Amino acid sequence: MKYVLLLTRGAWQDEASDDDKAAIFGQIGEWFAKYYADGTIVEAYKLREPHTATTVVLDRGSSTLIDRPLLEAKEAVGGYAVVNVPDLDAALELARSFPMPDGKVEVRPVDEM
């Protein structure tokens, strides 16, 4: 079954030293490489900073562009991974293994469109 892991930015990204960030990003890179190699990760992307987002608001045939993220949130999504695992428990275990010091990983099942 496929799930999306939504990866939020952690405080460490703003607070850690450059050396610590480099080490953490190295661990994250190894995590992605491991799960890409065994076929668990179907695709994954790092999102650019929230200030780069443009939101299209649709309203009964008209649209408005807003130069900001869809949601004004303290915790911004920093990336996502689509994973193919047997069940929710496996997806949760994968999320628990994500190597960042703090932050959140939302696990959500997906349906094909």
Where are these regions (language model features)?
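Conserved, structured core segments of small domains
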Residues: 1-113
